[in-house]
């Protein structure tokens, strides 16, 4: 597979995948875990809290690569240190991928808050996965309004993603998942 995208493919990825949405205050911030870009994820969540963009949060992410603390524990710890009240952050400690982030978090959200009480969600995760976060959430929770905030843990700015080998590889890997995941029913079109 050639990882050097054409100009047309770059334009399509920029328009369809590496997106952000206008923000408004939401009932819930859904933080998709990961080990790469933790500091940026925490900073974005704290910034959203300080600007009063969410009332509750859920952090989802399990253990990775033999590290004792889960992604959830690491990210939540950083959010609390940054000033987000611990009791407003729900926890999901088992997920190992985006689909599990959603599937394992929904019962936690339902038990703590009642899904019927949530009308809007901000998805927070890495830019390389971008649109796939709300597409996955939309597949399993279509009723809520979804917004997207992404962090960029790479050395290149987002508009130059295709010039950085690591950034390009991750974007292309995530971009190539969309159609097979759509066919398998893991995600659905959004918006």
Task: Give the residues covered by each predicted segment.
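A structured, mid-to-C-terminal "fold-capping" secondary-structure block
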Residues: 158-191
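A structural signal for short, hydrophobic/glycine-enriched beta-strand patches
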Residues: 1-171
